[in-house]
Amino acid sequence: MESLKCYRERFKGVFTDFISLKVSKKPVFDSQNYLVYGANNEVSKKEFVPREDDFCAIPILNDRDEAIISIAERMRHDDLSHSRWALGIITGNNAKVLKDRPKKDLEPIFTGKDIGKYSLKPASRYIKFNRADFQQCAKDEFYRAKEKLVYKFVSSRLCFTYDDTQSLFLNSANILIPEVDGMSIKTVLAFLNSSLFNFLYVKRFGDLKILRGNLSALPFPKIDAETDRKLSALVDEALKGNGNAVAAIDKVIFELYQFDTEEIRIIQEL
C-alpha cells in the first residue's frame, strides 16, 4: 500500500465516506509506511502493521488518536476472547410468534431498541418460549443466566446494559457473559460503556454493527480490588438512572490511564 486519500464529497444517495487506495505489487514486510491525504488536503505518513486479527482493516488516525490508543494498549492485561457469547432468538416469523400483550404462558422478550446504556425499556413484545418453534435459539443457560450483559447489535457505538432477570432477547440484541481477570461483570460493563472504550471501538473498527471479534480485541487493564469495588458500586447507581454515576465512571477510568486534559477532551468529543 502506497497511499490512501479521503474525500469530503459523497456520492448521491450514499451516506458512507469514500476513499481511493493506491497499491503496488511488492513483497509484504512486517510493517508498511503509507501516506494519508485527508479531506482537508493535509498529508501525514502512517505505519501499518498487518496482523491476522486486523481483518485487513486500515485505521485512519491522527497522531492524538494513535497516542490514546497506544496508552490503552500498553495497559492491556486481558480481553473478552475467552468470555461466553450468545445471539438473541431468531424466531423465523416475528409476525406470527411475537404478541403485543401479555397473556398466560407468554413472557416478555426484549429487542436491541429496548437497550440503552445502563437501561432497559419495558418490553413491548411477548412470546411463548418453545425453542422448537424458533429458527435459531441459544442454550437456556445464556438467557437464564443469573447475570448477563446484553448489547445493541446494530449500532455504531457501544451500548450495553445488565440483566439479572433471566429475560429473553431477540437477535437485534446479543448476550455476553464476560470473564475478565480481576473484574466483576459490572466492572466490565463500566469499561464497555465508558467514553474511552467507545472511542477505541469507533476509531479502530468504525463498523455499523457491534461484532464479537471486534469486542474481543478491546484491551482491558489490570485493576486492584478497590477499583473493582468502586466501579461496580458506580454501575449499581448508573443502573438506577443516576447520570452523575456515569460521569464518575469515566473519571475513574481516565485517572486509571492517567490521560491529560486534552486527551480526555478528544475522547469525550467523539
Task: Give the location of each predicted region.
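Signature of N6-adenine DNA methyltransferases within the class I
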Residues: 1-98, 169-173, 180, 185, ...
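Low-complexity, glycine/alanine/valine/leucine- and proline-rich hydrophobic stretches
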Residues: 165-167, 188, 192-193
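Conserved hydrophobic/aromatic beta-strand scaffold that supports enzyme active sites
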Residues: 18-22, 109, 150, 175, ...
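Polyanion-binding catalytic cores of nucleic-acid enzymes and NTP/SAM-utilizing transferases
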Residues: 57-168, 172-177
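Non-catalytic DNA-recognition/assembly elements of restriction-modification systems
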Residues: 48-93, 106, 112-113, 222-270
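Proline-centric
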Residues: 27, 173-185, 198-243, 254-260
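Short helix/loop capping segments that flank catalytic or ligand/cofactor-binding pockets
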Residues: 31-32, 118-121, 159-162, 185-186, ...
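Conserved short secondary-structure elements within globular domains
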Residues: 1-6, 193-201
